[in-house]
């Protein structure tokens, strides 16, 4: 299975996995329901505004790669779609409930810390604590058939490192590190500027007080 997904394909697969677990009575999804799921504002990063045409084009591509199937009946007026991405009879990717939850959440929101993943996978799987999330992540990193997740450099000022899925291809670790340094540098520059502004304001107040004192003595 060719598992390199475009951003839209990743969103579609993530939504289908999510809805299979959280709303089984309404799964498989119609094109309208799938588009709504892709564009919803909660538990999505970034928030998208895809048209049904955008989603259908991506779904057709995923059907061609056997990652999605059309489950509508012969006489059905509405097509319904389900994923074949993981945990299927003949599929390459077989996940535990916890692994599936983490992968799903990453497909929907990108890079996240173990703490964020534990909070955001509440409807998909149970984790006793953050350490259990970290343990599952390390299994996905060290997977014998090939890593599905990578640990990113810890951002300055952050307690936890983020993890990113590799289902959309290799991650440029240096780019993430550079972006982190740039963000910290920008923040530091902003703080320095604010400090200088505060110092200037204080000096102006002192000058005004001295002028008033001099004038009172004349």
Swiss-Prot record:
A Pfam family it matches: DUF480
Gene3D superfamilies on file: Winged helix-like DNA-binding domain superfamily/Winged helix DNA-binding domain
Disulphide bridges: none
UniProt record similarity statement: Belongs to the UPF0502 family.
Name of the molecule in the record: UPF0502 protein VS_II0353
């Amino acid at each position: 299975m060719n598992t390199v997904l475009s951003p839209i394909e990743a969103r579609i697969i993530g939504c289908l996995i999510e809805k299979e677990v959280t709303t089984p009575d309404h799964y498989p999804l119609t094109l309208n329901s799938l588009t709504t799921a892709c564009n919803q504002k909660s538990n999505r990063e970034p928030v998208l505004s895809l048209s049904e045409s955008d989603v259908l084009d991506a779904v057709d591509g995923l059907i061609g790669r056997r990652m999605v199937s059309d489950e509508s009946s012969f006489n059905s007026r509405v097509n319904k779609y389900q994923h074949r991405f993981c945990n299927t009879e003949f599929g390459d990717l077989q996940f535990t409930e916890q692994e599936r939850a983490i992968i799903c959440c990453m497909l929907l929101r990108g890079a996240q810390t173990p703490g964020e993943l534990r909070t955001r996978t509440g409807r998909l799987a149970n984790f006793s604590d953050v350490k259990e999330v970290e343990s599952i992540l390390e299994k996905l990193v060290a997977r014998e058939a090939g890593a599905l997740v990578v640990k990113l450099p810890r951002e300055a000022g952050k307690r936890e490192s983020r993890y990113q899925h590799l289902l959309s291809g290799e991650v440029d670790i240096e780019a993430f590190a550079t972006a982190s340094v740039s963000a910290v540098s920008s923040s530091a520059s902003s703080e320095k500027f604010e400090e200088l502004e505060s110092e200037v304001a204080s000096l102006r107040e002192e000058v005004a007080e001295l002028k008033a004192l001099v004038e009172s003595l004349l």
